[in-house]
């Protein structure tokens, strides 16, 4: 973590857990993904920077999933689990039932595996995470719902978009200002589930 990074400094000053908070703030301000009262499923939630922002907007139930622990956030049910674990479906469905959630208004993923520095490998790993998130999400997303996913851009990005965009009215690709400029990370936004 670069302690001279302006987003890091700002996050500390504004009591956000990570600089990533400003990514979701910018994306949501531009695309209105999450609104008050929405039920949200979030992948890759730890340490909770996105979760804090989302809870402040929705003031409703968030189900957050991460392989790493996360300190509590108001109105958030946290599931500490690897999304590739076979029990992930059951765990999410149980949390939904416990909180009277039939389906989600928005699903967000900032999930990423540890980077290796090998671009093709990092892209492939992020692609597989996005595929898994979509497999979990599509049956649990309401009509009209939205999904955001982080992916390292690469040669499978277009294939991924082509595969999943048919479930939605349209999609966008964005790179928030808070993303490091040298990073290949992009955010794929699928809007208005059909």
Swiss-Prot record:
Annotated catalysed reactions: uridine(2552) in 23S rRNA + S-adenosyl-L-methionine = 2'-O-methyluridine(2552) in 23S rRNA + S-adenosyl-L-homocysteine + H(+)
Disulfide bonds: none
Top-level taxonomic group: Archaea
Parts forming coiled coils: none
Enzyme class: transferase
An example Gene Ontology molecular-function term: rRNA (uridine-2'-O-)-methyltransferase activity
Chief site of localization: cytoplasm
Pfam families: FtsJ
InterPro entries per the UniProt record, alphabetical: RNA_methyltr_RlmE, RNA_MeTrfase_FtsJ_dom, rRNA-MeTfrase_E, SAM-dependent_MTases_sf
UniProt entry keywords in alphabetical sequence: Cytoplasm, Methyltransferase, rRNA processing, S-adenosyl-L-methionine, Transferase
Compartments where found: Cytoplasm
Stretch forming the signal peptide: none
Gene Ontology cellular-component terms listed: cytoplasm
EC number: 2.1.1.166
Location of the active site: 150 (proton acceptor)
Residues where S-adenosyl-L-methionine binds: 48, 50, 66, 82, 110
Family statement: Belongs to the class I-like SAM-binding methyltransferase superfamily. RNA methyltransferase RlmE family.
Function: Specifically methylates the uridine in position 2552 of 23S rRNA at the 2'-O position of the ribose in the fully assembled 50S ribosomal subunit.
Name of the featured protein: Ribosomal RNA large subunit methyltransferase E
Organism encoding this protein: Picrophilus torridus (strain ATCC 700027 / DSM 9790 / JCM 10055 / NBRC 100828 / KAW 2/3)
Gene (name only): rlmE
């Amino acid at each position: 973590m670069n302690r001279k990074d302006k987003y890091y400094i700002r996050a500390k000053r504004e009591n956000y857990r990570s600089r990533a908070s400003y990514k979701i703030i910018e994306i949501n301000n531009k695309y209105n993904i999450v609104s008050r009262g929405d039920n949200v499923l979030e992948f890759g939630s730890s340490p909770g920077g996105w979760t804090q922002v989302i809870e402040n907007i929705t003031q409703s139930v968030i189900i957050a999933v991460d392989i790493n622990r996360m300190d509590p956030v108001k109105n958030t049910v946290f599931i500490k689990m690897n999304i590739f674990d076979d029990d992930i479906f059951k765990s999410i469905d149980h949390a939904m039932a416990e909180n009277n959630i039939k389906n989600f208004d928005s699903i967000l993923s900032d999930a990423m595996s540890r980077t290796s520095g090998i671009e093709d490998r990092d892209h492939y790993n992020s692609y597989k995470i996005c595929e898994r998130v979509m497999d979990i999400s599509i049956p649990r997303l309401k009509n009209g719902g939205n999904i955001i996913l982080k992916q390292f851009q690469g040669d499978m990005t277009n294939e991924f978009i082509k595969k999943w965009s048919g479930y939605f009215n349209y999609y966008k690709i964005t790179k928030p200002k808070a993303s490091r400029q040298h990073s290949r990370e992009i955010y794929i936004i699928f809007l208005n589930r059909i």
